[in-house]
Amino acid sequence: MMKNKVIVKTIFPSIDKEYDIKIPVNELSWKVNKLIVKAVYDMNGIHIDLKEDKFVMMNKSTGKIYTNNVPIIDTDIRNGTEIVFLRET
């Protein structure tokens, strides 16, 4: 049974940082993506323009890239999942 939040390990190779973050399972992946990216960059004092800088969320163990309009609960993201945030070029 899934609660309303899961704890995932977020990995940002572009800034060499990793964080464990709770995310709501009822939100769409694009919204979770933007919120996490903004929070991580703000915590590190790095300016980011979310309109210009785009990131994709990729499952580290499976290589699956999550599409934007899928609720987290409908993905394979569960407690302990490692998600790599890759900057799009």
Give the location of each predicted region.
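Ubiquitin system architectures
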Residues: 2-89
